[in-house]
Amino acid sequence: MVRVTLVNYTRRPLETITWAALVSYWDEWSTESFEKINEDDVKAHLPRILGYGHESILEHATFTFSIEGCSRVCTHQLVRHRIASYTQQSQRYIVLNEENVEETFVIPESIKKDRELYEKWKKAMAETIKLYKESLKRGIHQEDARFILPQAVRSKIVVTMNLRELKHFFGLRLCERAQWEIREVAWKMLEEIAKREELRPIIKWAKLGPRCIQLGYCPERELMPPGCFKRTRERWMKLLEKPL
């Protein structure tokens, strides 16, 4: 099971974004005016400014997540989003100690459905762990012993993105056509934001969702799975059930 946690974010993020936006055209703007920005100011200005497509202001708010238990297949996709900061568990310094195959590796459900194949996978992965540990016992350094480990090995990573990049990330990775594991991570990240009462409005105003939510239509119509727009929209709307 992948665990995603929003561990930190910009203090008063909506007020910060609004305050930054107002510097462009508010004569009374000052450093001190930040503390005067309130919820009414946010509601009065932020939806309108974002509605114009002026999204650079979103870069003034950042969010830091911890992601635990995903595979290196997933983290390799994650770090392709280059306007972000990443720090990942190192196989050079951390020794793989788990004996349980399920706790050590991510095994896709498609493999588990084929019982015979699943048993072969577990056997192969158990042999991988055995050979990895034998290499360490023979004096092979961790930085070399890790070469035997597959991409399925579970990892941990800390991710920091500004809100504009987070919107771009969600647009691509919440889509049903995204690979299943990173899609699961992306939904958990969005759900973590939705848990915070002060953050939930930005999901609606900035349209933090897959591209079909952001655009109002699917840009990959010919490729989309049947019914995915309806399913995705319903799941997204559930995050907004409480009044904004």
Curated annotation (Swiss-Prot):
It is an enzyme of class 2 (transferase). It catalyses: dUMP + (6R)-5,10-methylene-5,6,7,8-tetrahydrofolate + NADPH + H(+) = dTMP + (6S)-5,6,7,8-tetrahydrofolate + NADP(+). One of its GO terms (biological process) is dTMP biosynthetic process. FAD binds at S56, R80, H81, R82, Q88, N162, L163, R164, H168. The keyword NADP applies. It comes from the Archaea. PROSITE patterns: THYX. A motif (ThyX motif) lies at residues 80-90. This is Flavin-dependent thymidylate synthase. Pathway: Pyrimidine metabolism; dTTP biosynthesis. It comes from Pyrococcus abyssi (strain GE5 / Orsay). DUMP binds at Q77, L78, V79, R80, Q88, Q89, S90, Q91, R92, R146, R173. Binds 4 FAD per tetramer. Each FAD binding site is formed by three monomers. Residues 2-207 form the ThyX domain.
